[in-house]
């Protein structure tokens, strides 16, 4: 069963067929980046985990 979501990071909109693929991508970003980039990835990751269907980095 798919759970599509949309992420908006650095102004770029990306459609994901599966929420958990997006979670994995942004989790990796949180673990490997620092500073403002890490904060952006964290914002999106938390929104994904909260069940939102459109998640931005702001």
Place the predicted regions along the sequence by residue.
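Short, charged, amphipathic alpha-helical segments
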Residues: 38-46
């Amino acid at each position: 069963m798919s759970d599509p979501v949309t992420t908006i990071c650095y102004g770029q909109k990306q459609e994901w067929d599966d929420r958990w693929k997006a979670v994995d991508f942004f989790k990796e970003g949180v673990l490997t980046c620092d500073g403002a980039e890490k904060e952006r990835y964290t914002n999106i990751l938390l929104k994904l985990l909260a069940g939102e269907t459109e998640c931005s980095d702001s």
